[in-house]
Amino acid sequence: MRYLTAGESHGPRLTAIIEGIPAGLPLTAEDINGDLKRRQGGYGRGGRMKIESDQVVFTSGVRHGKTTGAPITMDVVNKDHQKWLDIMSAEDIEDRLKSKRKITHPRPGHADLVGGIKYRFDDLRNSLERSSARETTMRVAVGAVAKRLLAELDMEIANHVVVFGGKEIDVPENLTVAEIKQRAAQSEVSIVNQEREQEIKDYIDQIKRDGDTIGGVVETVVGGVPVGLGSYVQWDRKLDARLAQAVVSINAFKGVEFGLGFEAGYRKGSQVMDEILWSKEDGYTRRTNNLGGFEGGMTNGQPIVVRGVMKPIPTLYKPLMSVDIETHEPYKATVERSDPTALPAAGMVMEAVVATVLAQEILEKFSSDNLEELKEAVAKYRDYTKNY
């Protein structure tokens, strides 16, 4: 399974093409649109989300509510494009129109300046448009397809925010994936401890009044994962490594950890390793899950627990200093629409990319042309691992 995304933030539409989804997977636009709506939601989102109401359109690969095995093409229209027809025109236009909304003051922390240098742009809008987090719309759409596949294989996935700008959220112990999903969905800030809800919302309001932004940490948890996905035989086949790459590819994500993560560096080995248990009913399990579901780059049957750290959104309403690329004079950075935080939305994107990598790994291990073949292969493998 592989995919590509295309489109600009203020272009006419966003597109994704997925190849390798087996035939026969039940799939409708509603399966995608629910996740797209959650990506646009969350406390603290800005004006762009009031303009767009993302709805996916299938243009290939799905017929009568099921995948056909052909490449799946999905489009999402950018409604805001109508205000940018000249600025984002694919055809050459008059110079006086080209100068409208031209960007020569790069924003610190964005791709603006480095993209301009790399691709030799005199208008940094070209960097801004493609590097925008608007692209994650299609990664969420791709992830929704992947999640539909994982659900057919009895795997479930959820995300929630565990740190808001330095404020850690206490997470009740032993929550199931379903409970995490339910609690986070009921929270405007995607947390599972509702006693902290108003405190976090008040904090976001204060950050907005200050013209500033905050980052944080989001966690994705996956249950029902088969043992042995990934491999130790080559560095690039380790599944936790593939997941780490996918997570830090998300806009503004700067770090990733599994299970205890960096805390493991402060503990003794006896306080980190997960003791192995066996029972006739469950087969092999672990007493704890400090390693986040991975040993040797492979899934060990425990829930996958992965966290990603998101830096504060770099577009500030009180902009930092920058330099004009035409005059080299100091200027305040360009201000585009921004949010005080996008952590709840980022959690949806992280959930999507994790689901996508897991679907890719499943289809690599259990190559199948149609869904029934895949389900039979996975069920047979689960029986084998349980009775090993």
UniProtKB/Swiss-Prot annotation:
Catalysed reaction equations from the record: 5-O-(1-carboxyvinyl)-3-phosphoshikimate = chorismate + phosphate
Could you say which residues form the signal peptide? Answer: none
Which sequence ranges are marked TM in the entry? none
Question: What cofactor does this chain's UniProt record say it requires?
Answer: FMNH2
Q: Where does FMN bind?
A: R130, S131, S132, N251, A252, G296, K311, P312, I313, P314, T315, R337
**Which superkingdom, per the lineage?**
Bacteria
Instruction: List the GO terms this entry assigns under cellular component, sorted alphabetically.
Output: cytosol
Keyword Nucleotide-binding applies: no
A Gene Ontology biological process noted in the UniProt record is: aromatic amino acid family biosynthetic process
InterPro entries documented for this protein: Chorismate_synth, Chorismate_synth_AroC_sf, Chorismate_synthase_CS
Task: Tell me which residues bind NADP(+).
Answer: R39, R45
Keywords on record: Amino-acid biosynthesis, Aromatic amino acid biosynthesis, FAD, Flavoprotein, FMN, Lyase, NADP
Note whether Zinc occurs among the keywords: no
Question: What Pfam families does UniProt report for this protein, alphabetically?
Answer: Chorismate_synt (PF01264)
State any single GO MF term. Answer: FMN binding
Q: What is its EC number?
A: 4.2.3.5
**Pathway participation:** Metabolic intermediate biosynthesis; chorismate biosynthesis; chorismate from D-erythrose 4-phosphate and phosphoenolpyruvate: step 7/7
Question: What does the UniProt cofactor note say?
Answer: Reduced FMN (FMNH(2)).
Described by its record, this protein's role is as follows: This reaction introduces a second double bond into the aromatic ring system.
The entry's family comment says: Belongs to the chorismate synthase family.
Stored PANTHER family: CHORISMATE SYNTHASE (PTHR21085:SF0)
SUBUNIT field: Homotetramer.
Q: Which NCBIfam families match?
A: aroC, PRK05382.1
Q: What is this protein called?
A: Chorismate synthase
User: What is the organism of origin for this protein?
Assistant: Streptococcus pneumoniae (strain ATCC 700669 / Spain 23F-1)
Q: Recite the lineage of the species.
A: Bacteria, Bacillati, Bacillota, Bacilli, Lactobacillales
